[in-house]
UniProtKB/Swiss-Prot annotation:
Residues 1-46 are cytoplasmic. It is a single-pass type II membrane protein. Residues 91-159 form the POTRA domain. One of its GO terms (biological process) is FtsZ-dependent cytokinesis. HAMAP family: FtsQ_subfam. Its main location: membrane. This is Cell division protein FtsQ. Belongs to the FtsQ/DivIB family. FtsQ subfamily. Keywords: Cell cycle, Cell division, Cell inner membrane, Cell membrane, Membrane, Transmembrane, Transmembrane helix. It comes from Jannaschia sp. (strain CCS1). Essential cell division protein.
Amino acid sequence: MTTRSPARPLIARRSTPAPTPAPHDPAPSRLSYRVTRLWLTPIFRKALHLGIPVFALFAAVTWYLGDETRVAELFEAVQEIRREVENRPEFRVNVLGIDGASDDVTEQVRAALALDLPISSFDLDLDELRGRLEALPPVRTADLRIQSGGYLAVRIDERIPAAVWLTHEGLSIVDGDGIFVAGFGTRELAAPLPLLGGEGANLAVPEALALMEASSILDDRVHGLVRMGERRWDVVLTNGSRILLPEIGAAAALDRVLALDDMGEILSRDVTAVDVRNPGRLTVRLTDAAMEELQRLQTLAAERPDGDTRG
């Protein structure tokens, strides 16, 4: 049997040419170009290098603090470290020193501070303690400093008692500015103080002290000063007599009365008041007994013949 070869086509087929590959563009794509440009920006690179660690740290801290137990343990550890530092000997105050205050005021200062020594300097609020002390009536200003060796130095500028002020509410001690210092009898006084009376007397203490100084020539015959109508002063003597001073020029008017008394002892006579409120006129008011005696003498003088001057 003869093997037949496959039939060949009468018309030869032309082979299909392979597709031509697209030309390669060496330029980068827009996205690649923008990414490259962004990466080459110094600010972006720094932000990326710094931002990733910061974000990682923030995430870690957030995760750690998300557990209340761990937060409580961390807080307790910090508090323990703080306590150890605060309780170190070099930070403790062991001694309290008070300077510039009398014995009575010193006791008030100690009571106001109410410090339980020894105490850590971190537990002392000096501004708050200063406010306590300056709220005390006898304290003008206070200065507090923590010095080496655990010494708390307190410097007091004390109000000096200058006068005793009498009002309807009782007696009180005031300083040279008329500011309340203490109730009368609540503290010892180094010397007797001038007595002032009347409403508003505390507002004119400097003038009152000047008048008391001017009247010192009368020694202990001056009982005190009374403020009248919150405008002027009356000088009250121990025998009950008064010197009525004007609102303006009180010191000069008082000097006139003292000069008259030096010449004629007018204040030692039977007078109830010497009125010098009018600068151009001095008025003397006699006691009732003196007025009766004066009237008797005037009556006798009227009954006598003219020219008869015998008593």
